[in-house]
């Protein structure tokens, strides 16, 4: 008899949804329902625990991230090709805690390390190896060939560092050649020479091009049609046409279409319906229908909510303007998901702390890691600022005004997750009014301490770093273009953008 058949199906289900349909699901036991049941039990344990797990352990999280700068745990040996991603997760996590400079010389050291991962065009000095005829881009680790996804991680990490040294690290001309070489006839981008292509690799290529101001018509050609073909009957997007809708690929498709000013071409009502059902009673987001929630989807799904809400708000305002000729009302509205419940899932259920370190795991009672710590903080950030994406602007680069994306942050959310001192029990019912007022003030102070830095929903980089990066990148472009010593080939390269 299999382990699945041995399970006692008369055992009480803790989920309200499942309990209401117990007769329907008792005969359909799968690995997912078993895992879901275990996770719900873990959440109940956390809810009944008296341990202090209701706040973001910022100092301990910072210790955990900084510890990864010098040495990576033995368990990470299999991630050698993801060194560039580990760098981004650590740097971005520290930056969201507004503590990037807490580690001595981290900006300079990180910039120099990331420069080693860059492959120059035509056998340049970086990563010089035999038959390296096709340079440009970044590899995932030392001496690795260039990969579009690794390139996105490297460029993002250099943006997070935010110094002139980090911006100058990137060879934009070689990068453009690399991206063009990855372009497919379907309008997508392959991961590497001879590699696969999907909506993920396509987003990474488009995001890199937009961040480096090298997004041209020839790079954009066919991309919108390919991404739109990835939307499924469910409403979300798959890796490529006729795949199952998936939270990560949905983010990649929606974010790339936002960069390309094509959100209006999406079946938005279908997408809205699909993503609305992705938040569970636990507060977390699941990546696919009938799958477990996962901390990383706090960003992947949370960002999609914000992007499409920006779309709805924009057209709502347009309709108001067209109706009465006056500027549309700026109503203060919450986001399309339960912000406080999402923060509760990440902070209370998935934060794993010991005496020295803290971080986030994918599920309750699992080990913390850099990946989920980074995206857990990103999801918390997105849920703490109601207007973070209210005015996502056109991301076309090199217009007459050189406008770049920088969604405004006008107010903090009122839905910052806090737990009262009585920990949801009735022991303090007899507190006098003065005590209650003090508790209220303490909760307000705790709310301020629980805020993390706001990140851009499309790039997952702190907004101030996004704005600074686009401004400095534009300055470097203009400076290089005006330099009399620039090569003829480089002049032809930059002419693509001047004549766009």
Swiss-Prot record:
Zn(2+) binds at residues 294, 296, 372. Its EC number is 2.5.1.58. Binds 1 zinc ion per subunit. (2E,6E)-farnesyl diphosphate binds at residues 246-249, 288-291, 297-300. GO terms for cellular component: protein farnesyltransferase complex. It is an enzyme of class 2 (transferase). PFTB repeats lie at residues 121-162, 172-213, 220-261, 268-309, 343-384. It comes from the Eukaryota. The record marks 85 as: Important for selectivity against geranylgeranyl diphosphate. Residues 119-133, 420-449 have a biased composition (Low complexity). Belongs to the protein prenyltransferase subunit beta family. Catalyzes the transfer of a farnesyl moiety from farnesyl diphosphate to a cysteine at the fourth position from the C-terminus of several proteins. The beta subunit is responsible for peptide-binding. This is Protein farnesyltransferase subunit beta. It comes from Dictyostelium discoideum (Social amoeba).
